[in-house]
């Protein structure tokens, strides 16, 4: 009698990150006899921890797309081959191609996210339709914006794209100097009316505060969507989500894409079993079924368009789909991840010190040039 296969997986430490994978694992084990033990890492570690180190300890790893250039150099992940058409065609927005790099597919999207708008439906009649409305709410002390690294840079990316000049991922200059400076000025003007604690907060911290009855925050114009907070009774106050506010008449285009994909370690002793689970959990049946029911934020359109999935989440998916479909893929070259952290910290320091927008965008562009492969 053969020994049952037990895989090890690593995901991120939030109910959205681990509960759907645990639920899907239970279904998979019942069907195929393969178990998976999931460990977790903090959100900050998730964005910065070396993937190669994880690949030497785990069979399955949840990653985000800016890592793909680094993992290609490290040769620590196994590229997916074979029939992936169902997953590719069902991908929401650019989620599937965001993990395609140098001719190979390094992960399969299981979670789709981008910067959208969060709001309090118990106190606002509708989400803020445009940036002028956001500014008016901010002057009343009713707006927050997560600015802890890397989210400060994500806001800059999104605003620059909304102004008509998305980041140039191939370089050499990441931001158009004039548009980048305009985006920094927009950020600075907003942050003057926002509690400075936001410089220390990531999206989860903002949501946890916003979902309390006595919180003053009614609108967060740019924040990575978390479907859990749109559920009834997840927190004391149920939040609503919408497309990001319009800026300059261009609609909800250019939001900095987030989300996660599932990858297979090149060092796994059970490659076939790991690949089989990854392909199943990223496809339609699992995504709109056990993955969504357990609190996941699926990456497959079958879930985003499903009536039952939307009903449970206050129409989260339909309300933010246009922003997700118009989202922008961040740079992914080897060397990008250190840049992302350094540029985020540099941006916050410049905003807090009152440094000129032109000087600040020039320095961020300098950091980006230095990160590019030679």
Per-segment meaning from a language model:
Residues 33-91, 218:
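Extracytoplasmic "Venus flytrap"/periplasmic binding protein-like
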Residues 292-342:
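Long, aromatic- and glycine/proline-rich binding clefts that accommodate carbohydrate-like moieties
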Residues 325-374:
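Conserved C-terminal helix/tail region of periplasmic/extracytoplasmic solute-binding proteins
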Residues 108, 115, 133-173, 179, ...:
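Extracytoplasmic/periplasmic solute-binding protein
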Residues 171-202, 244:
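Glycine-centered hinge/linker elements that transmit conformational signals in sensory
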Residues 193-269:
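Extracytoplasmic/periplasmic substrate-binding proteins
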Residues 3-15, 34-40, 60, 143-144:
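Short, well-ordered beta-strand elements
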Residues 66-116, 126, 241-242:
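Hinge/lid segment of periplasmic solute-binding proteins
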């Amino acid at each position: 009698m053969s020994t049952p296969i037990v895989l090890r997986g690593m995901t991120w430490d939030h109910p959205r990150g681990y509960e759907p994978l645990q639920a899907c694992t239970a279904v998979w084990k019942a069907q195929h006899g393969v178990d998976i033990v999931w460990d977790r890492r903090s959100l900050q570690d998730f964005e910065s921890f070396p993937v190669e180190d994880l690949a030497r300890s785990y069979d399955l790893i949840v990653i985000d797309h800016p890592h793909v250039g680094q993992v290609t150099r490290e040769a620590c992940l196994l590229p997916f081959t074979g029939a992936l058409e169902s997953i590719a065609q069902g991908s929401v927005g650019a989620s599937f191609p965001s993990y395609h790099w140098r001719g190979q597919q390094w992960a399969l999207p299981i979670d789709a996210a981008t910067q959208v708008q969060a709001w309090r439906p118990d106190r606002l009649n509708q989400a803020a339709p445009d940036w002028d409305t956001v500014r008016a709410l901010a002057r009343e002390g009713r707006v927050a914006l997560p600015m802890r690294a890397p989210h400060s840079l994500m806001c800059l990316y999104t605003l620059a794209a909304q102004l008509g000049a998305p980041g140039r991922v191939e370089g050499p200059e990441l931001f158009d100097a004039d548009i980048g400076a305009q985006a920094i000025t927009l950020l600075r003007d907003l942050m003057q009316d926002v509690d400075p604690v936001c410089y220390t907060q990531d999206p989860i911290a903002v949501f946890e505060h916003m979902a309390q009855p006595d919180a003053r925050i009614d609108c967060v114009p740019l924040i990575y969507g978390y479907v859990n907070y749109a559920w009834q009774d997840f927190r004391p106050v149920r939040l609503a989500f919408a497309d990001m506010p319009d800026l300059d008449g261009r609609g909800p285009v250019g939001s900095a894409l987030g989300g996660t994909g599932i990858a297979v370690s090149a060092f796994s002793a059970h490659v076939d079993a790991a690949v089989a689970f990854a392909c199943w959990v990223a496809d339609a049946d699992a995504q709109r079924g056990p993955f969504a029911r357990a609190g996941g934020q699926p990456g497959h359109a079958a879930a985003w368009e499903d009536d039952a999935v939307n009903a449970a989440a206050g129409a989260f998916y339909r309300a933010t789909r246009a922003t997700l479909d118009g989202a922008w893929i961040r740079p992914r070259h080897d060397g990008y991840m250190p840049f992302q952290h350094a540029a985020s910290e540099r941006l916050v320091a410049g905003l807090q010190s009152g440094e000129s927008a032109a000087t600040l965008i020039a320095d961020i562009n300098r950091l980006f040039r230095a990160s590019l492969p030679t």
